Amino acid sequence: MRHDLWAPVLLRAVVALVFAAVTVFWQQPSLTTGRWLMAFFLVGTGISAIFLQVRLNRREDVDLGASRSIPQSYGVLYVLGGALTAVVANSDWLLVLLCAVIMGLCGITELVLGMRFRREFPLGRDWSLCGVVTVFAAMGMVLVENLGTKAELGVAGGAAIVLGVSQLVAALSLRHDARAADGTGRGPERVA
């Protein structure tokens, strides 16, 4: 399939929205619950970035130059950070430290990538938005660390809502554009 970038973007949206829904409705999460939820979010986001890299590698019409492998790089960092969070984060401050560092580094990387390609590539603006939201979520988690796991997950979950909705809109737009470009977006012609 020529135009298949919508699938990894949709995967990221689903991961973010599932995480957001759980964090909103789980009223008193324990530290163990919090670390596993954050691990799910980080690993899921990383897998979607690696999936995006696989799809980008198949497309000859996408030229990101030397920046071509950046989604894979921050995807691997997300996955490793999520695994480390699940295994090591046995206190609130350690959970916040790990998640804030991972989200901060990946968010800055995604923001820079988005700024570089915001006019040239359809995902450029989405990368910029996701990068900014992720960096602010990392900073917010640091600010509410003393308030406990619910507050930390609340900040990350709030960011996940923004990420999920924006990525869902982006995925649907990419899907629509892909179908229009392939000529399959139209239904059967009606004869009067």
PLM feature spans:
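N-terminal topogenic module of multi-pass integral membrane proteins
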Residues: 1-63, 146-149, 172-192
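Core segments of alpha-helical transmembrane spans in multipass integral membrane proteins
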Residues: 11-16, 38-51, 69-83, 101, ...
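Hydrophobic alpha-helical transmembrane segments in multi-pass integral membrane proteins
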Residues: 19-20, 80-90, 133-150
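Structural signature of hydrophobic alpha-helical transmembrane segments
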Residues: 30-46, 90-105, 154-161
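Cytoplasmic-side transmembrane-helix entry/capping segments in multi-pass membrane proteins
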Residues: 62-77, 98, 122-130
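Membrane-proximal helix-loop-helix units in multi-pass membrane proteins
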Residues: 80-127
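Alpha-helical membrane segments in multi-pass integral membrane proteins
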Residues: 98-108, 122-141, 155-165
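Membrane-water interface at the C-terminal end of transmembrane alpha helices
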Residues: 110-119, 141-145, 163-178
